[in-house]
Amino acid sequence: MSKQQKILFIDRDGTLIVEPPVDFQVDRLDKLKLEPYVIPSLLKLQEAGYRLVMVTNQDGLGTSSYPQADFDAPHNMMMDIFESQGVKFNDVLICPHFERDNCSCRKPKLGLVKEYLQGGKVDFKSSAVIGDRMTDLQLAENMAIRGIQYHPQTMGWLDIVKDLTTKPRVAQVVRKTKETDIQVLVNLDQTGGNQIETGLGFFDHMLDQIATHGGFQLQLKVVGDLHIDDHHTVEDTALALGQALREALGDKRGIGRFGFTLPMDECLAQCALDLSGRPYLKFDASFSRPQVGDLSTEMVYHFFRSLTDTLACTLHLSSSGDNDHHIIESLFKAFGRTLRQAITVQGNDLPSSKGVL
């Protein structure tokens, strides 16, 4: 099965090019006119990782009412213009039938896009159909993806770009086991308003350090088996938080990816982070007592170990000092400050030569 991709299935007449109001056919070069801002918008959508597929009904194409040659001249000119400006359509799907033919490929039927659906090519959460007619929205519904109705005044191409490229980086994770019941909500583009309840006061304070210094909003509630000890609560919180952070980051396009910090307070806390998609932890800190507040010091390493597993990051973290409270706090603060650098959006590029993180 092919890797699922973000695909925009885009109508032609009335969406990419102006549809003639009288005969609804672009059958001469002088009738070819692009919709406003379509080229810069398609370029931005490509930069954001979308693949472009044209899907169009062309009534009676190849018949006497719409000769193939009449269609080809303006269509090929349109494609040449797009290509010359860097816009690449990965596929052009055309239904040539009349509605009365009752074919299987005319939108909103699925015949034209059948290969994409059956081949596992479509990322259903991120893909969309863009078109000016209700049939385009019906196609989207039949494909189980989002539909966006284009209109040059109310939902033009600049609006569509903004809509598709500025999605909130928010994720919610619910994790339930026999030992814990955890709900996590992270918003990477909001700060403040953190609400953290794990049943462990010192641990709550440490998690708040990550969110505050990481520059994101965290809402977290944990009901755990603290009547036994803090192990499951700390471990499962880390797993759920790491998963939520990873989901909120999405495809990681535009992020800094890397981060590092150095001294904090009287402790020498060092942190280097790579949101690489590969979990690895190098941890160096020692403690002189078994607990700080209600948190077992042995669980500090275990927290970051579990977090790196679900966040899928490479993390080098160390701290030295004389006070265990300050050592632990410096570790969480340093991680938060480093995470802030790594998740900050700096553009649209994917920070990887592999093309995936």
Curated annotation (Swiss-Prot):
Residue positions of the active site: D11, D13
InterPro entries the record matches: HAD-like_sf (IPR036412), HAD-SF_hydro_IIIA (IPR006549), HAD_sf (IPR023214), His_synth_bifunc_HisB (IPR020566), HisB_N (IPR005954), Histidinol-phos (IPR006543), IGPD_sf (IPR038494), ImidazoleglycerolP_deHydtase (IPR000807)
Principal location listed in the UniProt entry: cytoplasm
Catalytic activity field: D-erythro-1-(imidazol-4-yl)glycerol 3-phosphate = 3-(imidazol-4-yl)-2-oxopropyl phosphate + H2O; L-histidinol phosphate + H2O = L-histidinol + phosphate
Residues reported in the UniProt entry to bind Mg(2+): D11, D13, D132
Enzyme Commission code: 3.1.3.15, 4.2.1.19
Keyword annotations of the record: Amino-acid biosynthesis, Cytoplasm, Histidine biosynthesis, Hydrolase, Lyase, Magnesium, Metal-binding, Multifunctional enzyme, Zinc
Cofactor dependency: Mg(2+); Zn(2+)
Keyword Chaperone among record annotations: no
Residue span of region Histidinol-phosphatase: 1-168
Molecular functions (GO terms): histidinol-phosphatase activity; imidazoleglycerol-phosphate dehydratase activity; metal ion binding
GO cellular component, one term: cytoplasm
Classification via PANTHER family: IMIDAZOLEGLYCEROL-PHOSPHATE DEHYDRATASE (PTHR23133:SF2), IMIDAZOLEGLYCEROL-PHOSPHATE DEHYDRATASE HIS7 (PTHR23133)
Protein name (Swiss-Prot/TrEMBL): Histidine biosynthesis bifunctional protein HisB
Organism per entry: Vibrio cholerae serotype O1 (strain ATCC 39315 / El Tor Inaba N16961)
Gene name, Swiss-Prot/TrEMBL: hisB
